[in-house]
Amino acid sequence: MAGQLAAVLGTGQTKYTTKRQDVSMNGLVREAIDRALADSGSTFDDIDAVVVGKAPDFFEGVMMPELFMADAMGATGKPLIRVHTAGSVGGSTAVVAASLVQSGRYRRVLAMAWEKQSESNAMWGLSIPVPFTKPVGAGAGGYFAPHVRAYIRRSGAPTHIGAMVAVKDRLNGAKNPLAHLHQPDITLDKVMASQMLWDPIRFDETCPSSDGAC
């Protein structure tokens, strides 16, 4: 069965917002999972493995939350894989889940990514002191900005490539009623006029701190 095709059978999302004080972390992820199972016509019994995407644990202040949340995610007695690739964790989670199906190892995989940043403080979580980070005081943006500049230099991409991506993403987000931000009038000029944070990254290229699961 190696090399078999992978497909999305169903999806489920919560409303993304600054604070979801009406649910716990378990309740938040279960809300999205229940919707995905209903959309796919599946039950937990149909799931062979669970892949959970989660960025830094400091965003919620709970280390390895996937372990105590296993019951809520229907992962009891099943393989549970944690994916953490920082800002790309949402896409990486889908890639890992698809690869498990394509390899023939599992038939149905539940992929779920989430954050509940209101439980902690994202600015603190991205600016933690030693021994967790090198004592340079750069923060997440300070580490990523040189990579963006290097990409622009190597590829010949325009210096405003990040702003172009932000406009595309904001316009797509405006079509999703569950999205945190709705900016249907966003333009390249508006993004370029926003505050410079870490050259060449501007404020309107960054994401909000959100509670949500998918």
Each model region followed by its residue ranges:
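Hydrophobic or amphipathic alpha-helical targeting/insertion segments
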Residues: 98-112
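Glycine-rich anion/phosphate-binding loops
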Residues: 27, 88-92
